[in-house]
């Protein structure tokens, strides 16, 4: 989980209060002409409209079953694998729903980029979310049980036969310090969703293995209603630097007022010929004018890495985007960072969708 200091949280809270106060003092006419007034609603609706959807399958819980998704991914469920949240064994008809994210475009639409919680880049063989229900009752897997998954896949970039499994974390922990009703110093930890979409944490006891007999990558999922993926850490021996992406235009200032929810302005980097996606979600603080934008994790971007950037924004219900190829260059002079500037121009919603999908072939 990514931790925020109380100072950062205070800045966020103060900004949110300031924006709220300003809105209350503005007239309706002024609010409708403010290009940054939608607070991410346009981008949120856009992403939700094109996000990967669940596929549902009906199985016999007592007998066990297997089914194959539209992507050719096979799921096998042992007999008697389900139980209620109260621990009662389940038989009869059960609905199993799966959501699969296997491409950079789906990573954007589903807000599931491939980076670890500490900023390392992952080469993805797929991200998976599975849930099961009987009627209106949510089910879980029995202790020490698992469903088996087989993904059509071949090793990429010299990966060996063993690929780590990862658990998805879409929250950040905020640490708040203050005083309680008895004037005693206290520290609280609060969790909330964040802009990064998800951070991946390795499950040290779980791996996926290539099956040369049928050309699949095989692994187990031992928990429902949680994101799992089978990704290899990208090995790059190059010196790392910090990257800053500047927006020369159409940066929605409300991107900087709240650490939670959807960002009306966003920036992605797709390394060439790798099934991975980097989302730069940390905003540049104290930025003005053309210095507004996003910053990578500190010293996390390999110098010389080539890829395609996609800068996107929404203002006043309109879409803006720019796609450009770029290289993570070495810092100039005494700088400890490298930069690239973007100038998103107005596009249609269809154009925005097509730009995102085109990342799959980069």
What are the language-model segments listed below?
Residues 1, 16, 354-357:
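N-terminal helical oligomerization/adaptor scaffolds that assemble large protein complexes
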Residues 1-10:
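Bacterial N-terminal signal peptides that target proteins for export
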Residues 10-16:
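Bacterial N-terminal signal peptides
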Residues 18-21:
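C-terminal motif of bacterial Sec signal peptides marking the signal peptidase cleavage site
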Residues 23-26:
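Bacterial signal peptide processing site
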Residues 28-73, 80-94, 98-106, 111-362:
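Proteolytic cleavage junctions
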């Amino acid at each position: 989980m990514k931790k925020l200091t109380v100072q950062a949280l205070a800045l966020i809270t103060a900004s949110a209060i300031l924006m709220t106060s300003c809105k209350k003092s503005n007239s309706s006419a002024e609010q409708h002409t403010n290009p940054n007034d939608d607070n991410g609603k346009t981008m949120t609706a856009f992403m939700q409209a094109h996000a990967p959807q669940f596929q549902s399958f009906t199985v016999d819980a007592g007998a066990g079953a297997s089914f194959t998704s539209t992507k050719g991914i096979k799921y096998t469920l042992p007999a008697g694998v389900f139980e209620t949240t109260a621990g009662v064994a389940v038989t009869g008809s059960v609905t199993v729903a799966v959501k699969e994210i296997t491409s950079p475009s789906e990573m954007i639409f589903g807000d599931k980029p491939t980076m670890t919680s500490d900023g390392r880049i992952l080469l993805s063989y797929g991200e998976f979310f599975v849930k099961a229900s009987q009627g209106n009752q949510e089910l879980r897997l029995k202790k020490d049980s698992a469903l088996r998954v087989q993904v059509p896949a071949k090793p990429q970039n010299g990966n060996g036969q063993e690929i780590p499994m990862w658990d998805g974390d879409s929250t950040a922990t905020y640490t708040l310090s203050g005083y309680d009703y008895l004037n005693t110093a206290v520290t609280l930890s609060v969790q909330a969703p964040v802009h990064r979409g998800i951070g991946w944490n390795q499950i040290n006891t779980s791996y996926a293995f290539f099956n040369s007999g049928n050309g699949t990558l095989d692994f187990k999922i031992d928990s429902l209603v949680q994101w799992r993926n089978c990704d290899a850490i990208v090995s790059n021996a190059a010196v790392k630097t910090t990257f800053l992406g500047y927006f020369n235009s159409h940066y929605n200032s409300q991107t900087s007022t709240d650490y939670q929810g959807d960002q009306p302005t966003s920036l992605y980097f797709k390394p060439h010929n790798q099934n991975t996606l980097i989302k730069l979600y940390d905003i540049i603080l104290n930025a003005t004018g053309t210095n507004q934008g996003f910053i990578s994790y500190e010293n996390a971007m390999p110098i010389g890495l080539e890829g395609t950037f996609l800068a996107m924004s929404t203002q006043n219900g309109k879409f803006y985007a720019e796609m450009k190829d770029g290289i993570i260059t070495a810092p100039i002079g005494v700088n400890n960072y490298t930069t690239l500037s973007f100038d998103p121009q107005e596009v249609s919603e269809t154009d925005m969708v097509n730009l995102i999908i085109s990342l799959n072939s980069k």
